[in-house]
Amino acid sequence: MSKVWSNRFDGSLNPFIEEFNASISFDKTLILEDIECSIAHAKMLSKTKVLSTDESLKIIEGLETIKEKFIEGKFCPGAPSEDIHYCIEEKLINLIGETGKKLHTGRSRNDQVGTDIRLWLRKKIDNIDILLYELQNSLFSIAESNIYTLIPGYTHMQRAQPLSLAHHLLAYLEMFQRDRERLKEVRARVNISPLGAAALAGTKIKIDRYFTAEELGFGNIYKNSIDAVSDRDFCIEFASSSALIMSHLSRISEEIILWVTDEFSFAKLTDKCATGSSLMPQKKNPDVPELIRGKTGRVYGHLQSLLTMIKGVPLSYNKDFQEDKEPIFDTVDTISSCLKAMTILLNEGIEFNVEKLMDSVHNDFSNATDLADYLVFKKVPFREAYQVVGDIVKYCLSKNILFKDLQLEEFQTFHNEFKEDIYENLNPMNVVKSRNSLGGTGFDQVKLELNNWKKKLFT
């Protein structure tokens, strides 16, 4: 099949180079967006009298027919077409004849592909936002049921202070909310139309860029034709936001992997979201969070690929930009599947071991800060109180006992301000309840945050 640009050349393209150069194997993903873009362009050419009404309608009807055949599975784009743009144009010409050759008037593949990928990515961002929202709902539901369930809080992966499990899960709601806000900002910059910039310099053909932008639902148009076809910063922004989403998914995945180990036993996997071993019959493997954790590197790699692709490219359009699609397509697929998998895991695949969680916070030194705070409330300087508690911890470790095992007289050998009420202050439920500063893990604060989230998510 001859190329539309082949008249400039005397010789034929090397078959391997032809295959190497082609993008149809992956940019066929954009078929519906390319048709949508072309329909808007045909309408505009009619409005500006570049095409007659009959010509425009004939082109639009042809494009709609191609769309229907694709949806019905009767048209499968592929080789020998070079890319999805030529593929559809060739199909259109075969379908409606010479009129189809007029469709490309006043545009280039450079602004065309930029429009297509923005249309595609805009839809995908909206879909990902829905998946993030559903994940937040799942986290909210578990949090709402576990206000009074305690879990050890960690710093440096060492027991630090007891927390409400709800408070712990709400931290992830905050992270995923920021992810949604970032995507919203990215979407605003994706939602700008490059159509009409042509190859790089605009066109002398009478066009109406605002008309096509409005037809396609764009919020604005690129004001500089070179910029319109020269940058893929919106792809990089999306990939960056996606990398952050995956980092948050990876962190909660890592925690779940730890929680379901025999060493932690804070939770267990249900049969719906676990697999076994081909050799070891006792195994129940956390494949879902492990896969999510593993796929995070894949999305990070796509971000690096896009950054490297763009870094040394002079203005304006270059063939390098063909390499933007596969990373973005795979990023969308990966993010979407991981978000859905995590939501299913939270809804159906994990059960918290409340007894083990409560037992854990009753049998450690995570209430040490409260021991120091007790003395602070007795007007003892904090640094002095800190040192006193450090001595008590050392003493308890030497005896293989906990604070709760000490007699009052033993406490008083370290400081005479210790009284009988010290035991009440060391109770983990009271420890958590007392952390009532704004944004803290205190039960009243957690309830306040749950109410705030209920308004955000459900109203």
UniProtKB/Swiss-Prot annotation:
Its EC number is 4.3.2.1. One of its GO terms (molecular function) is argininosuccinate lyase activity. InterPro entries: Arg_succ_lyase_C, Argininosuccinate_lyase, Fumarase/histidase_N, Fumarate_lyase_CS, Fumarate_lyase_fam, Fumarate_lyase_N, L-Aspartase-like. Keywords: Amino-acid biosynthesis, Arginine biosynthesis, Cytoplasm, Lyase. The keyword Cytoplasm applies. One of its GO terms (cellular component) is cytosol. It is found in: Cytoplasm. It is an enzyme of class 4 (lyase). Belongs to the lyase 1 family. Argininosuccinate lyase subfamily. This is Argininosuccinate lyase. The lineage of its organism: Bacteria, Bacillati, Cyanobacteriota, Cyanophyceae, Synechococcales. The gene is argH.
